[in-house]
């Protein structure tokens, strides 16, 4: 029904299925419970990223707004984000950075807030496309539902991004794993 590929979840499920096929139901039940625990961690991370995003957008921690302009290396160090990630996020349209006359990028306090949001969502395994979709919706409607924006690809999105419904996918995977756990218990 649904496949969640992140953080080795698929491999764990395959291992559990093989273990069950060998009729080692006790080990298979242990594996499915580990899988469920990891799904719960992933869901918690996804929800936490949404909470952090709401907090940043609500103005909590706006002290960054008064910082002087920073260069890429300074931003990288301040936010513990690699310079490659900053370049990647810029190339993928998540961030548009101003430049000085000499061509150096300069990051504003607003840019830092946006980067904190992107970092939180990426750490929770949201795709670049989901983040871009959410940022676009928020720029048009600051009151937009963050969870819905992250979890609802548009009809124009590619087939790859249709699989980008992280919270929905994790919820479906959890539901399926509980069903499998019940079946394994019955088979035991």
Model-derived segments and spans:
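Short polybasic/polar patches that bind polyanions
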Residues: 77, 91, 122
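Minor-groove-contacting beta-hairpin "wing" of winged helix-turn-helix DNA-binding domains
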Residues: 103-109
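Major-groove DNA-recognition helix of helix-turn-helix-type DNA-binding domains
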Residues: 83-103
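Polyanion-binding surface elements
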Residues: 65-86
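Arg/Lys-rich, alpha-helical DNA-contact motif
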Residues: 1-71, 109-188
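Residue-level detector of functional hotspots within protein domains
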Residues: 80, 93, 112
């Amino acid at each position: 029904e649904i496949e969640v590929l992140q953080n080795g979840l698929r491999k764990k499920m395959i291992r559990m299925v093989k273990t069950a096929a060998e009729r080692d139901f006790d080990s298979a039940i242990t594996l499915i419970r580990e899988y469920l625990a990891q799904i719960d961690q992933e869901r918690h991370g996804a929800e936490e990223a949404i909470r952090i995003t709401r907090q940043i957008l609500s103005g909590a921690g706006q002290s960054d707004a008064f910082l002087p302009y920073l260069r890429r290396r300074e931003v990288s160090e301040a936010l513990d984000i690699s310079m490659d990630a900053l370049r990647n996020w810029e190339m993928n349209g998540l961030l548009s950075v101003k430049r000085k006359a000499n061509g150096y990028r300069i990051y504003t306090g607003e840019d830092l807030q946006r980067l904190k949001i992107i970092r939180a969502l990426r750490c929770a395994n949201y795709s670049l496309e989901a983040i871009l979709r959410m940022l676009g919706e928020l720029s048009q409607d600051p009151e937009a539902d963050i969870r819905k924006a992250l979890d609802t690809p548009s009809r124009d999105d590619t087939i790859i991004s249709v699989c980008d419904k992280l919270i929905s996918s994790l919820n479906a995977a959890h539901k399926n794993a509980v069903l499998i756990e019940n079946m394994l218990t019955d088979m035991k």
